[in-house]
């Protein structure tokens, strides 16, 4: 075998490429990529070329995939068998800086300075001194280990029984051989053990492929030989003469042709499921399953949200660079999944290329993927028309299954097992919503998330913002028993959207949790859901645990759905060409989001949803946007919830000046929600509020609308039976409601004279009130008060005292002397008559003869 690689290839730089997470397109960020992104093809003759380029981790040297797996397995000098420790970091076995001279091998235990140059070959090969091979506990990279005498390697301390020098797995194998346990009928323990060993060996092969870029020159030299040993062990475990042919040609073609056939021809690693032909196109139709009947809420506006789930699929493509992606990669993924994803986005990062695809699929589709991941990976390869999926090594993780293929042939399909102890679990993150253009301090709590083999990733907007080892982020102040806590800070751009926090181990298995980036008022409301998502506070003894888990699932589904909503809105707002613009958000899912926000009284979220709706971001199922909104009956829902803040927001919300209903001209702003809107049987929100006994605040909000429609409708709006909201309140005995609204009417509308007409022939009483307007003009408004359930058709009986009084008043009105003007005229006439009588009558004057006449008088003396 040649001396290894002549020249190390360098991994592509993430900063040299711009990745479109929606279109699945990679474009160089500069005119010419930097040297570190170019593939160097210098290889030695006769070398095994697995199509793997060497990698150089740019973010953190400790996270180098090339250092993760080079020493993950070793060859036993006695029998040639290979035993592997999954998930071990090769940094544990690399020489510690400053502990010994770099000219010779040294012990890998922390603080050990023993030079192994003069030690036995056994100690050199395993990089351990004689003392530490017999030690009960040693520390490697500050983690407790113990050297296994049978595996000839270090294992984590928890893999040993107390006082034992061999790990539990080796002891179990030894005990089975020693005791010769009789195998029950139908159970083949040896075959199960061989399958387990085969899986481990293939996984070690995967790790070795990831670790060809080890920094040590000796490791580069032994890399191809080490792969050959892995292939030999794989063939030995397969146990067939056909697979022994791989010993002759230890290259990728031989591995693909033989090992791929071993898996594909029914020798499944996990079950005896018959193989499904890959070449035939299978339609992803929903299987006939028993529908859930219990716990079905008839009032739920959107049931589909419970039947879809957002999850991810991870691919690791060896020997590939971003420019190897075809232009129709997104179309290939959608065709592979039979166009079932309703939403999809992707992220890439070096190593060689790790492609993470988040998608929203129906639950039945996720179940089909989990039931037979090997079939679906083979289908992806068979449908491909380019070399991306057909050449080189490809690792894929579909939910809890790992697959490995080479040159289009499937080699491995295995359920994922944790590297250390139990599986990882994210219990809670905070905050779940971050304001745009801000820096957030995240806290991640979980189980088994801080391990030597795990790292934390924070992704947003198609980019990886954080890639750090979890041990560096571990909060030392919270190292008590129980969940582990990771803390880190991250800055976000001014764009809104949805991101993920991932905890990943070196097997590429990872957990993720969503978070939202939006306006501050929107984030402050969404953060109120954190207590529902906190699994740390859940106690197994709680009676209502199932209800809490259901509420958590609903809140988590809202985060995913609102995240997809923000993603589509951002894409539509920033797309330069129509082809890049995705279709609008589905109306049914929008109704579910709106219903959830109204149920939680998220006023800022409702405003965000409505603004996007009027900007054309939703595919409506009706012609008019206003009609779509009014059909949701938001005011009625707010009144039934007795939510005064929500009513205040709805009554003051106006449409923006953005084009509505797809028209080119901007529609004028208008108030969408009014308190006098009529519902079934012409009942208004005022009628409903008047019937409740604890809705004084709600009624106060309904009568405080900007257009003053509430106080006008209080006595005028009638339902199908002719009753007003005031009648509803009076019948329920809510006099305080009547007094409150009447005070508003008196204070906001000027007082006027009231004329009352009483008639013996009328059956009703009419009140007419005249109000002066701001322009000093009077408008007459009639308030008809109907008492009783129905208006009686019989005339009411006349009052016995009213008839004589009316007749008396009528008689007095005809007597003119009672009027002051007539009396004055009579007095003047009487004076005139008296003067006339005096003038015409002959007065008797003493001393004069004859009658005295006025006309006989002379004027002046003679």
From Swiss-Prot:
Biased composition (Polar residues): 72-87
Keyword Transcription regulation: yes
Binding site for Zn(2+) 1: 107, 112, 129, 132
One MF annotation (Gene Ontology) recorded for this entry: zinc ion binding
Keywords: DNA-binding, Metal-binding, Nucleus, Transcription, Transcription regulation, Zinc, Zinc-finger
Record's subcellular location: Nucleus
Sequence motif Bipartite nuclear localization signal, residues: 164-180
Cross-referenced InterPro entries: Ankyrin_rpt-contain_sf (IPR036770), SBP-like (IPR044817), SBP_dom (IPR004333), SBP_sf (IPR036893)
Annotated binding of Zn(2+) 2, by residue: 148, 151, 155, 167
GO cellular component term, pick one: nucleus
Coiled coil: none
Annotated Pfam families: SBP
Zn finger residue spans: SBP-type: 104-181
Region of interest called Disordered, as start-end residue ranges on this chain: 55-98
Tissue: Ubiquitous.
Function: Trans-acting factor that binds specifically to the consensus nucleotide sequence 5'-TNCGTACAA-3'.
The record's note on its domains: The SBP-type zinc finger is required for the binding to DNA.
Protein name in UniProt: Squamosa promoter-binding-like protein 1
Organism of provenance: Oryza sativa subsp. japonica
Classification lineage: Eukaryota, Viridiplantae, Streptophyta, Embryophyta, Tracheophyta
């Amino acid at each position: 075998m040649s001396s290894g690689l002549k020249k190390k290839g360098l991994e592509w730089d993430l900063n040299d490429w711009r990745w479109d997470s929606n279109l699945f397109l990679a474009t160089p960020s500069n005119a010419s990529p930097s040297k570190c992104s170019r593939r160097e093809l210098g290889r030695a003759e006769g070398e095994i070329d697995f199509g793997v380029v060497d990698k150089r981790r740019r973010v953190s040297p400790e996270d180098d995939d090339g250092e993760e797996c080079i020493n993950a397995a070793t060859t036993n000098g006695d029998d040639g068998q290979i035993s592997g420790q999954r998930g071990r970091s090769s940094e544990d076995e690399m020489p510690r800086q400053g502990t010994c001279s770099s000219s010779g091998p040294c012990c890998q235990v922390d603080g050990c300075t023993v030079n192994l140059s003069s030690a036995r070959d056994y100690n050199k090969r395993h990089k351990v001194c004689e003392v530490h091979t017999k030690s009960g506990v040693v520390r490697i990279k500050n983690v407790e280990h113990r050297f296994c005498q049978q595996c000839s390697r270090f294992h984590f301390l928890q893999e040993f029984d107390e006082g034992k020098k061999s790990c539990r797995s080796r002891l179990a194998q030894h005990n089975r051989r020693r005791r010769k346990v009789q195998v029950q009928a139908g159970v083949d323990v040896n075959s199960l053990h061989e399958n387990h060993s085969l899986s481990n060996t293939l996984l070690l092969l995967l790790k070795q492929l990831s670790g060809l870029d080890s920094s040590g020159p000796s490791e580069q030299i032994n890399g191809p030989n080490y792969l050959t040993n892995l292939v030999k062990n794989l063939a030995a475990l397969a146990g067939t003469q056909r697979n022994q042919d791989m010993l002759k040609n230890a290259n990728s073609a031989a591995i693909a042709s033989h090992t791929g056939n071993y898996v594909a021809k029914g020798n499944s690693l996990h079950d005896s499921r018959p193989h499904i032909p890959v070449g035939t196109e299978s339609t992803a139709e929903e299987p006939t399953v028993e529908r859930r009947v219990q716990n079905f809420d008839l009032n739920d506006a959107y049931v589909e949200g419970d039947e879809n789930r957002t999850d991810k699929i991870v691919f690791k493509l060896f020997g590939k660079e971003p420019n190897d992606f075809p232009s129709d990669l997104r179309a290939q993924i959608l065709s592979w999944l039979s166009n079932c994803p309703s939403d999809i986005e992707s992220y890439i990062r070096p190593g060689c290329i790790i492609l993470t695809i988040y998608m929203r699929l129906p639950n039945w589709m996720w179940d089909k993927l989990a039931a037979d991941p090997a079939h679906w990976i083979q289908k992806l390869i068979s449908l491909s028309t380019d070399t991306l999926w057909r050449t080189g090594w490809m690792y894929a993780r579909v939910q809890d299954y790992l697959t490995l293929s080479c040159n289009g042939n499937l080699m491995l399909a295995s359920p994922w097992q944790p590297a250390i102890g139990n599986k990882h679990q994210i219990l809670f993150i905070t905050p779940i919503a971050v304001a745009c253009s801000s820096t957030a301090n995240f806290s991640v709590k979980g189980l088994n998330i801080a391990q030597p083999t795990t790292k934390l990733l924070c992704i947003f907007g198609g980019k990886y913002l954080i890639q750090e080892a979890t041990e560096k982020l571990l909060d030392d102040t919270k190292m008590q028993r129980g969940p582990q806590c990771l803390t880190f800070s991250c800055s976000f751009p001014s764009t809104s959207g949805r991101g993920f926090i991932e905890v990943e181990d070196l097997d590429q298995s990872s957990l993720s949790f969503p978070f939202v980036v939006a306006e501050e008022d929107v984030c402050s409301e969404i953060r109120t859901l954190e207590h529902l998502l906190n699994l740390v506070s859940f106690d197994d003894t709680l009676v209502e645990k199932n209800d809490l888990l259901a509420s958590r699932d609903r809140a988590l589904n809202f985060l995913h759905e609102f995240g997809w909503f923000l993603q589509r809105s951002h894409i539509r707002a920033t797309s330069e060409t129509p082809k890049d613009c995705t279709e609008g958000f589905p109306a049914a899912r929008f109704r579910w989001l709106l219903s959830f926000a109204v149920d939680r009284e998220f006023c800022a979220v409702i405003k965000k949803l409505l603004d996007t709706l009027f900007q054309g971001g939703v595919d409506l199922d009706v012609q008019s946007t206003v009609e779509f909104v009014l059909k949701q009956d938001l005011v009625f829902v707010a009144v039934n919830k007795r939510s005064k803040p929500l009513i205040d927001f709805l009554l003051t919300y106006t449409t923006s000046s953005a084009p509505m209903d797809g028209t080119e001209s901007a529609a004028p702003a208008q108030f969408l929600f009014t308190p006098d809107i009529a519902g079934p049987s012409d009942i208004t929100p005022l009628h409903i509020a008047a019937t409740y006994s604890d809705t004084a605040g709600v009624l106060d909000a309904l009568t405080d609308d900007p257009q003053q429609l509430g106080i006008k409708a209080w006595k005028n709006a009638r339902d199908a039976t002719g009753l007003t909201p005031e009648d509803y309140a009076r019948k329920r005995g809510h006099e305080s409601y009547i007094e409150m609204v009447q005070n508003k009417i008196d204070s906001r509308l000027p007082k006027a004279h009231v004329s009352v007409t009483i008639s013996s022939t009328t059956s009703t009483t009419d009140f007419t009130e005249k109000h002066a307007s701001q322009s000093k003009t009077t408008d007459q408004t009639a308030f008809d008060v109907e008492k009783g359930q129905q208006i009686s058709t019989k005339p009411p009986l006349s009052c016995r005292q009213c008839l004589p009084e009316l007749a008396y008043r009528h008689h007095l009105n005809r007597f003119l002397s009672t009027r002051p003007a007539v009396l004055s005229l009579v007095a003047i006439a009487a004076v005139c008559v008296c003067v006339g009588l005096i003038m015409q009558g002959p007065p008797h004057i003493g001393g004069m003869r004859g009658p005295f006449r006025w006309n006989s008088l002379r004027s002046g003396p003679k």
